[in-house]
């Protein structure tokens, strides 16, 4: 076993060879695919008469274009139906498992992998989706890849990559009331910048990270890419192992779990591992964070004032002016009181069961504001079923939320769930780019699920700490 960081160890464990161009060829332990980025890759294989090398290490789902209101086939959207049908044909020919809506296992690719135990410490994981870094929460090296790389992995079960530096981000202390993993990652991106992670992989550590459950760790690793990093990870620990023990992969095979656990423990970063950079953030100073602009790095604490562009670094000033104009905000204001038209609770960042529970604690006993249309889109069919078993669906529906089927939904404008005109959306998703939620004039405010819930019932961005929580049964 090599020494150093988890990144060093897992990289070396999976390195096949070093290529003439200096890149390393890595074996891929898990390849996740979906309906949007895989069709061209399969087409390129057919042109060359190449078969999928390891269908047993490839797993498919549908999430990006699948509707969340009515998933009956054929889909009303012809383009979406064509993508679904093409994926079905591709996986059938290759012998790849597909979690479609008929299976009870369908959902966002970065939700179903962990919940089924496909995601494990010490694995290399790739997917044609930028938020593949989510799986790093388990101590995996997980990378988003492009179509040509999807082709290469399908054909060879390997990928050529350049090794990056490692930045350790220590979040110390205890989080305050109403502060979540989403607030941690928005704070990190705000401080280091959306390009601050370029050339790096992030290792998240410190008391505040260690105290998070797996869902919180996934939220943080999920948005590593928004901070410019190639990937992000958390070292596996007992929290990780307890999660895995209950998944499909190990619930009925405890012996296999015990066989793999020593390897998982061995890939943890060594206490004396050397890092290329170390950043420390005091978690006790973080408050609920919301974005005021059109990048995830344009965020502030809920009590802070929107910055004046001239007070920002020179290369950020023009972007800030355009963002403030688009969002209709002014320097010196806070985001508290910003009117909201739509509340979206979902996405691969925040659509897991604890996310829904925490939002339901705010929603219970209250009603969605008259000016707001609100929806909850569970991250997977399993999350949806578990939430319904706990009665969370009733909490949301009684308050006036739409309770939807699983999918990516309003995180991106590739399906029926989109903003209209200049609607402002309180969103638990990961990106607030202009046009991201379907309308070029739409305005997205990123925040935690609890903050989305608070905005839904007040009709404006609201400090969730001002709203007493109700009890919901877990």
Swiss-Prot record:
<comment type="function">
    <text>Catalyzes the isomerization between 2-isopropylmalate and 3-isopropylmalate, via the formation of 2-isopropylmaleate.</text>
</comment>
<dbReference type="GO" id="GO:0051539">
    <property type="term" value="F:4 iron, 4 sulfur cluster binding"/>
</dbReference>
<dbReference type="Pfam" id="PF00330">
    <property type="entry name" value="Aconitase"/>
</dbReference>
<dbReference type="InterPro" id="IPR004430">
    <property type="entry name" value="3-IsopropMal_deHydase_lsu"/>
</dbReference>
<keyword id="KW-0004">4Fe-4S</keyword>
<keyword id="KW-0411">Iron-sulfur</keyword>
<dbReference type="InterPro" id="IPR015931">
    <property type="entry name" value="Acnase/IPM_dHydase_lsu_aba_1/3"/>
</dbReference>
<feature type="binding site">
    <location>
        <position position="408"/>
    </location>
    <ligand>
        <name>[4Fe-4S] cluster</name>
    </ligand>
</feature>
<keyword id="KW-0028">Amino-acid biosynthesis</keyword>
<comment type="subunit">
    <text>Heterodimer of LeuC and LeuD.</text>
</comment>
<comment type="pathway">
    <text>Amino-acid biosynthesis; L-leucine biosynthesis; L-leucine from 3-methyl-2-oxobutanoate: step 2/4.</text>
</comment>
<dbReference type="InterPro" id="IPR036008">
    <property type="entry name" value="Aconitase_4Fe-4S_dom"/>
</dbReference>
<dbReference type="InterPro" id="IPR018136">
    <property type="entry name" value="Aconitase_4Fe-4S_BS"/>
</dbReference>
<dbReference type="GO" id="GO:0046872">
    <property type="term" value="F:metal ion binding"/>
</dbReference>
<keyword id="KW-0456">Lyase</keyword>
<keyword id="KW-0408">Iron</keyword>
<dbReference type="GO" id="GO:0009098">
    <property type="term" value="P:L-leucine biosynthetic process"/>
</dbReference>
<feature type="binding site">
    <location>
        <position position="348"/>
    </location>
    <ligand>
        <name>[4Fe-4S] cluster</name>
    </ligand>
</feature>
<dbReference type="InterPro" id="IPR033941">
    <property type="entry name" value="IPMI_cat"/>
</dbReference>
<keyword id="KW-0479">Metal-binding</keyword>
<dbReference type="GO" id="GO:0003861">
    <property type="term" value="F:3-isopropylmalate dehydratase activity"/>
</dbReference>
<keyword id="KW-0432">Leucine biosynthesis</keyword>
<comment type="similarity">
    <text>Belongs to the aconitase/IPM isomerase family. LeuC type 1 subfamily.</text>
</comment>
<dbReference type="InterPro" id="IPR050067">
    <property type="entry name" value="IPM_dehydratase_rel_enz"/>
</dbReference>
<feature type="binding site">
    <location>
        <position position="411"/>
    </location>
    <ligand>
        <name>[4Fe-4S] cluster</name>
    </ligand>
</feature>
<keyword id="KW-0100">Branched-chain amino acid biosynthesis</keyword>
<feature type="region of interest" description="Disordered">
    <location>
        <begin position="293"/>
        <end position="313"/>
    </location>
</feature>
<dbReference type="InterPro" id="IPR001030">
    <property type="entry name" value="Acoase/IPM_deHydtase_lsu_aba"/>
</dbReference>
<protein>
    <recommendedName>
        <fullName>3-isopropylmalate dehydratase large subunit</fullName>
        <ecNumber>4.2.1.33</ecNumber>
    </recommendedName>
</protein>
